[in-house]
Amino acid sequence: MADGSSDAAREPRPAPAPIRRRSSNYRAYATEPHAKKKSKISASRKLQLKTLLLQIAKQELEREAEERRGEKGRALSTRCQPLELAGLGFAELQDLCRQLHARVDKVDEERYDIEAKVTKNITEIADLTQKIFDLRGKFKRPTLRRVRISADAMMQALLGARAKESLDLRAHLKQVKKEDTEKENREVGDWRKNIDALSGMEGRKKKFES
């Protein structure tokens, strides 16, 4: 018996069912402070990892900058060869300067031509992009300003000379004179009196005579 009671005591108790809150308490539950879940990584470890990532990124940037400087130096060394000025006279130095100026002018012309081609390509790309947007119907709408205009002015702007004809709605209506309505009222009279007059023997006699 003792062993059975000890086994029952060792068994874990079932977790209680979660309490379902009412909809009226949702707002209070959302605003009340809750115990935040503790992350598996401590704050000091997070700071250490951030510092390490920043150091790695800094090293990568420095390495890329060094590679760009090396490529620039290699390109300049291949294109701009060192000048041999030892033992040159005044006339030879003048000729060398003329040659260098001619090379500079040629490079400037090539640079201008390349820039013109790039500008032309950019404009062509922009035109083609605009044509694509026009074909798709996705054009940029201009900004419209609010303008106060009456209905008459709007119809005048849309229809022109036909606006007056369309706005004159009473022209197509049938005009009824007041005298005609009074005459009809006199002829009809009170319908109750007509029914009373035609009811009974006298009414039948009147119908027979008519």
From Swiss-Prot:
Known outcome of mutating P82S: Risk factor for CMH7
UniProt keyword annotations, A-Z = Acetylation, Actin-binding, Cardiomyopathy, Disease variant, Muscle protein, Phosphoprotein
Q: How is it modified after translation?
A: Phosphorylated at Ser-42 and Ser-44 by PRKCE; phosphorylation increases myocardium contractile dysfunction. Phosphorylated at Ser-23 and Ser-24 by PRKD1; phosphorylation reduces myofilament calcium sensitivity. Phosphorylated preferentially at Thr-31. Phosphorylation by STK4/MST1 alters its binding affinity to TNNC1 (cardiac Tn-C) and TNNT2 (cardiac Tn-T).
Spell out the InterPro entries in the cross-references. Troponin, Troponin-I_N, Troponin_I, Troponin_sf
Q: Which residues carry this modification: Phosphotyrosine?
A: Y26
- Please give a single GO biological process term from the UniProt record: regulation of smooth muscle contraction
**Residues found modified as N-acetylalanine:** A2
Region entry Involved in binding TNC, spans: 32-79
Region Disordered: start-end pairs:
1-43
Provide GO CC annotations from the record. cardiac myofibril; cardiac Troponin complex; cytosol; sarcomere; troponin complex
Q: Which disease is it linked to?
A: Cardiomyopathy, familial hypertrophic, 7: A hereditary heart disorder characterized by ventricular hypertrophy, which is usually asymmetric and often involves the interventricular septum. The symptoms include dyspnea, syncope, collapse, palpitations, and chest pain. They can be readily provoked by exercise. The disorder has inter- and intrafamilial variability ranging from benign to malignant forms with high risk of cardiac failure and sudden cardiac death. Cardiomyopathy, familial restrictive 1: A heart disorder characterized by impaired filling of the ventricles with reduced diastolic volume, in the presence of normal or near normal wall thickness and systolic function.
On assembly, the entry states: Binds to actin and tropomyosin. Interacts with TRIM63. Interacts with STK4/MST1.
According to its UniProt entry, the function of this protein is described as:
Troponin I is the inhibitory subunit of troponin, the thin filament regulatory complex which confers calcium-sensitivity to striated muscle actomyosin ATPase activity.
What is the name attached to this protein's record?
A: Troponin I, cardiac muscle
Q: Which organism is it from?
A: Homo sapiens
